[in-house]
Design a protein with these regions (language model features):
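Hydrophobic alpha-helical scaffolding
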Residues: 16-23, 56, 60, 73-77, ...
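Acidic/His-rich, divalent-metal-binding segments that scaffold phosphate/diphosphate chemistry
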Residues: 1-79, 89, 95
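Short acidic (Asp/Glu) and glycine-rich catalytic loops that position anionic groups and cofactors
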Residues: 5-13, 62-67, 82-88, 111-112, ...
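Acidic/histidine-rich catalytic neighborhood
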Residues: 92-150
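Short, well-ordered loop/turn and helix-capping segments at boundaries between secondary-structure elements
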Residues: 36, 72, 76, 89-96, ...
Length: 215
């Protein structure tokens, strides 16, 4: 046995209503979703494949997905934090280099964060991207979290992931990536786009809507 810590997930029932599988089967399903990104031509997977190609080592996501729910052995509450604690010595035992270890542990700790952001916040608000950029820190961690969230959700139940959720998820990803790339320049870019949109609407002279209302 290479990962004795995984034993506690075997046949572990997850009582949240959206979970259809035991923790061990869910983990394997999530890994299978990552395989599909590489091997299938399903349109929804193409942007995730592109994001993977931009990562330093896309194979690390297999390890991250394998370990992301390992903390559930100690209970669902706080399982992200307990997962980090359990995974840390395991990664050291496997000889994973420090930089890669840090990346894997970051995603384990924050593997629920991205979905919560786009579920609870306006992804079109620049402040949402700014706040998420502050959380993820850099593009490498963002790309890994972006793909991981997709695989994790589809590994729970493919039917739970629809085009609406995918649009919100990808909108947050792209806005955050832009924020990380341009920094404070994003605010100026957003304001410029806003002004251009306002000018276009004013030029159309929409019946019953004044220029002041548009502005």
């Amino acid at each position: 046995r290479f990962i004795v810590e995984f034993d506690a997930l075997t046949c572990l029932v997850q009582h949240e209503y959206y979970h259809r599988y035991t923790a061990d089967v869910h983990t394997l399903n999530a890994i299978r979703e990552l395989d599909r990104i590489y091997t299938e031509a399903e349109p929804i997977t193409l942007k995730y494949r592109a994001a993977l190609h931009e990562t330093t080592d896309s194979s690390l996501l297999y390890l991250t997905l394998l370990l992301h729910d390992i903390g559930k052995a100690e209970g669902i509450r706080g399982h992200s934090d307990s997962g980090v604690r359990l995974a840390t010595p395991l990664l050291e035992r496997f000889g994973v280099k420090p930089a890669d270890r840090e990346l894997v542990l970051f995603v384990i700790k924050n593997h629920l964060a991205m979905a919560r952001f786009w579920q609870k916040r306006d992804v079109d608000d620049p402040q949402t991207a700014a706040a998420f950029a502050e959380l993820v820190g850099n593009a490498e961690q963002l790309r890994n979290l972006y793909v991981h969230t997709f695989c994790d959700a589809r590994g729970t139940a493919v039917s739970l992931w629809n085009s609406y959720k995918d649009t919100l998820h990808t909108s947050l990803y792209r806005a955050t990536l832009e924020r990380l790339s341009l920094g404070d320049g994003v605010a100026a870019s957003y304001e410029k786009k806003k002004q251009m949109t306002q000018q276009e609407l004013i030029a159309r002279k929409i019946l019953g809507v004044s220029a002041e209302e548009i502005a």
